[in-house]
Curated annotation (Swiss-Prot):
Residue ranges of the region described as Disordered: 347-374, 473-519
SMART domains reported for this sequence: PDZ
Disulfide bonds: none
Modification Phosphoserine, positions: S148, S192, S250, S334, S348, S492, S508, S510, S511, S512, S514
Protein name from the UniProt record: Na(+)/H(+) exchange regulatory cofactor NHE-RF3
Name of encoding gene: PDZK1
Gene source species: Pongo abelii (Sumatran orangutan)
Superkingdom as given in the UniProt entry: Eukaryota
Domain called PDZ: residue spans: 9-90, 134-215, 243-323, 378-458
Modified residues (Phosphothreonine): T451
Composition skew (Low complexity), residue ranges: 505-519
Feature: compositional bias, Polar residues: 357-367
Similarity annotation: Belongs to the NHER family.
Length: 519
């Protein structure tokens, strides 16, 4: 069957500052990573790329089932040359329709890459190929996790072995020869065997591993591709966040929202019997992670109330119960990442607040004759009564967090922050490769003032293309921090008067010790 399809290997090379001359896209109701708008005379055209081609492999890494932003990232990280294995559009659609194993196409027998004739690890009765790191949560049974740790001569790192059949580790998704990347959110790739053993022992009766399987690990080592923790699969975790969709009734949604004391964030309380909240599956003590697709983990009470109000007569909450919250905290992962790959019952995909563009040019920005003085910005923010006044967003699979919805007249606006600014440093620490939740934590722990080194989109692309490190010395000195007395909310279009005004179905009660709002 596979012999009727002939994938093509296209080797593209470009000059520094030049682009490859094509767009890499995902399109609605169309499968695969599509090649579009191949420019005449470009490296892409010279290499044989054609409009409608589907990309199967990048530098011999199979990418057909990977998330689009990861595929884009692989091309960008290839520098000035990249090898693409592509299949023309008609052949691709026929191959998908006849269920041809696309991974086998174009494989040369002499290659010693991933073995396509060997069954992938079997999980829950089906064949599962792991192409990304995965989180595995283990809770001891009978004083044992059901695995051992080993080191391999000539190889860096610690690996899983002696997996007990039907034991805790096996049930959690651990495979023999898995490479251990993290223990409870801490990277252990450079740790010794003894250090890793000690970390597992100190973890007590539960532990969270970030693992990658043997074949994928080998391939990433050969291709010198670094794993990004934010691309980890969450599918094996036993507890997951819940998306609760509600329509407002005559008496509101039927629950109270309270600021947590021991538990950070906003907590669901006092759900009315028969209310929209109860019928939708909301539970007492649920922690609110996101409102209508927007993270609220860093927001204060009134800001979250305002975001729910903005939804009108319906709202969507991403919530976690205490057990799920504790599990994600152990992994040092934000439950908000669940949004970014979650498939909903109707088949649609719940995207992150900053959705992947449908059209992405895979290139370094072309040189222009126009001279632009590209500079990063050093912005000093003094927290207002209710926050800094901006959203912090991230896209799964891409480095960096970026600014969205800067509130006019707020601390962020007055300090010079703008929508789409990429955060480079927080208080002098480079956070470009740090995951979203860690950047949030750095800003939260800054107290009443924070200094951000940011870069506008065009300037960021320019520095990346020229391979110029973005450092604070390139920026102009910051202005004096703005007056912190203004009541502006972090990550919310907030009116401090409206948040405390009683609506027909919403009441807000605030004191120095607690905040409690009926929804």
């Amino acid at each position: 069957m596979t012999s009727t399809f002939n994938p093509r290997e296209c080797k593209l090379s470009k000059q520094e500052g030049q682009n490859y001359g094509f767009f890499l896209r995902i399109e609605k109701d169309t499968e695969g990573h599509l090649v579009r708008v191949v420019e005449k005379g470009s490296p892409a055209e010279k290499a044989g790329l054609q409009d409608g081609d589907r990309v199967l492999r990048i530098n011999d890494v199979f990418v057909d089932k990977e998330e689009h932003m990861q595929v884009v990232d692989l091309v960008r990280k290839s520098g000035n040359s990249v090898t693409l294995l592509v299949l023309d559009g008609d052949s691709y659609e026929k191959a998908v329709k006849t269920r041809v194993d696309l991974k086998e196409l174009g494989q040369r027998q002499k290659e010693q890459g991933l073995s396509d004739n060997t069954l992938s690890p079997v999980m829950n009765g089906g064949v599962q190929t792991w192409t990304q790191p995965r989180l595995c949560y283990l809770v001891k049974e009978g004083g044992s996790y059901g695995f051992s740790l080993k080191t391999v001569q000539g190889k860096k790192g610690v690996y899983m072995t002696d997996i007990t059949p039907q034991g805790v580790a096996m049930k959690a998704g651990v495979l023999a020869d898995d490479h251990l990347i993290e223990v409870n959110g801490e990277n252990v790739e450079d740790a010794s065997h003894e250090q890793v053993v000690e970390k597992v022992k100190k973890s007590g009766s539960r532990v969270m591993f970030l693992l990658v399987d043997k074949e994928t690990d080998k391939h990433h080592v050969e291709q010198k591709i670094q794993f990004k923790r934010e691309t980890a699969s969450l599918k094996l975790l036993p507890h997951q966040p819940r998306i609760v969709e509600m329509k407002k009734g005559s008496n509101g949604y039927g629950f109270y929202l309270r600021a947590g004391s021991e538990q950070k964030g906003q907590i669901i309380k006092d759900i009315d019997s028969g209310s929209p909240a109860e019928e939708a599956g909301l539970k007492n003590n649920d922690l609110v992670v996101a409102v209508n697709g927007e993270s609220v983990e860093t927001l204060d009470h009134d800001s979250v109330v305002e975001m729910i109000r903005k939804g009108g007569d319906q709202t969507s909450l991403l919530v976690v119960d205490k057990e799920t919250d504790n599990m994600y905290r152990l992994a040092h992962f934000s439950p908000f990442l669940y949004y970014q790959s979650q498939e909903l019952p109707n088949g649609s995909v719940k995207e992150a607040p900053a959705p992947t563009p449908t059209s992405l040019e895979v290139s370094s920005p072309p040189d222009t004759t126009e001279e632009v003085d590209h500079k990063p910005k050093l912005c000093r923010l003094a927290k207002g009564e209710n926050g800094y006044g901006f959203h912090l967003n991230a896209i799964r699979g891409l480095p960096g967090s970026f600014i969205k919805e800067v509130q006019k007249g707020g601390p962020a606006d007055l300090a010079g922050l703008e929508d789409e600014d990429v955060i480079i440093e927080v208080n002098g620490v480079n956070v470009l490769d740090e995951p979203y939740e860690k950047v949030v934590d750095r800003i939260q722990s800054s107290g009443k003032n924070v200094t951000l080194l940011v870069c506008g989109k065009k300037a960021y692309d320019y520095f990346q293309a020229k391979k110029i490190p973005i450092v604070s010395s390139l920026a102009d000195p910051p202005d004096t921090p703005p007056d912190s007395k203004e009541g502006i909310v972090v990550e919310s279009k907030h009116d401090s008067h409206m948040a405390k005004e009683r609506a027909h179905s919403t009441a807000s009660h605030s004191s120095s010790n607690s905040e409690d709002t009926e929804m």
